[in-house]
Amino acid sequence: MNKLETMDYININKNSWNAKVDYHLKSDFYFVDEFIAGRTSLNEPELELLGDIQGKKILHLQCHFGQDSISLARMGAEVTAVDLSDKAIVEARILAEKCGVDVNFIESNVYDLANVLEEKFDIIFTSYGVIGWLPDLDKWAKVIQHFLKPNGEFIMIEFHPVIWMFDDDFTKIAYDYQSTEPIVETYEGTYADREAN
């Protein structure tokens, strides 16, 4: 993918995520009311990987509207979280305020993060459904390396890539497992609300 194609892809991706935010906030998938009341968004596998994070500096990449970021802060971490979607970051800040939690939310293309952030982190965290949207995993890995303290940890919890072989209805294999192209999805609604327009 050339630079122009990459920027086009990133802008399309940003617009897509901006369009999903309101639907996701209202969906049962994200259980926002329960979350504000104290329910964590983190599942057992990532909680086990994270362990005791009290006082640790964590960078959360591709945070959407911040549920996992806020959950990490509730566990005592000092959290900085980044997302491409400006709308998601606005809503993340509102959600953090409703939860009474302090998180530094940054709106940025993850590849350009070094232009707006200078810190180093004990842990870099990312979760579920993030790598399929990235047009350049090598460049993403360099971002992680740049922000990680010596002896720091990168913790990623992600779906197995075999999931990306299936069609949008998950009924048949439609894509090559070894594909190096970005994923392009065409469907009605969002993964959190299939009725969303």
Residue ranges: model-predicted function:
Residues 126-128, 157:
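Residues lining the SAM
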Residues 138-153:
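A short glycine-rich, Lys/Arg-flanked "PGG" loop and its adjoining helix->strand segment in the class I
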Residues 57-113:
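Class I SAM-dependent methyltransferase SAM/SAH-binding core
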Residues 1-54, 67, 153-189:
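Conserved class I S-adenosyl-L-methionine
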Residues 193-197:
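A conserved mid-domain beta-alpha-beta active-site/ligand-binding segment of alpha/beta enzyme cores
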Residues 115-124:
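A short acidic, Gly/Pro-enriched loop at the edge of an enzyme's catalytic core
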Residues 132-133:
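A short His-aromatic
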